[in-house]
Amino acid sequence: MVIGLKEKYKTTVTQALKEEFQYENIHEVPRFTKITINRGLGEASQNAKALESSIQELTLITGQKPIVTRAKKSIAGFKIREEVPIGIVVHLRKDKMYSFLEKLINLTLPRIRDFRGISPKSFDGKGNYNLGLREQLIFPEIDYDNIDQIRGLDISIVTTAKTDQEGLALLKKLGMPFRES
């Protein structure tokens, strides 16, 4: 029987982290708050099709419709006017978050060419992990024939961990493939 990531966290990971870091209360154990998937689209101001195809791709990947982010100020150097779409973002919480994380760990990351693990140095100092992917083709939902251009995306995994060591231990115990540094 395959055990889900949320069940694995509740049954084995919380107890292991509680023993490893000597937490007195179960609520001190780090947990996931949200996962944010972001894609910057500089060309969206000139190419409306790029925005539409990116929205469709992120909807397929996450199962949730992304929010269009717009420019707050006009910047002549970047040829951006105020209120022009410049990116899209999705915030995943609860079951969709665990489902996406399980798919990322077990299906998506192993499909990267020459994959030797992800860097353990991408923590922000507060236990949150940031990951940049260079292409959307590694996701099983994306069909190679239906994309117009290869675009990357950023994934931020937000946890309640106080330190990077706690966040690293949480992700390692859930099976995140970190490379040995």
From Swiss-Prot:
Localization per record: Plastid, Chloroplast
GO biological process per UniProt: translation
Alphabetic keyword roster: Chloroplast, Plastid, Ribonucleoprotein, Ribosomal protein, RNA-binding, rRNA-binding
Gene3D superfamilies with a match to the protein in the record: 3.30.1440.10
Superkingdom of the organism of origin: Eukaryota
Gene Ontology CC entries for this record: chloroplast; ribonucleoprotein complex; ribosome
GO molecular function list: rRNA binding; structural constituent of ribosome
Pfam families linked: Ribosomal_L5, Ribosomal_L5_C
Disulfide linkage: none
SUPFAM superfamilies per UniProt: RL5-like
Principal cellular location given in the protein's record: plastid
Purpose of the protein: Binds 5S rRNA, forms part of the central protuberance of the 50S subunit.
Quaternary data: Part of the 50S ribosomal subunit; contacts the 5S rRNA.
Protein family: Belongs to the universal ribosomal protein uL5 family.
Record-given protein name: Large ribosomal subunit protein uL5c
Species of provenance: Porphyra purpurea (Red seaweed)
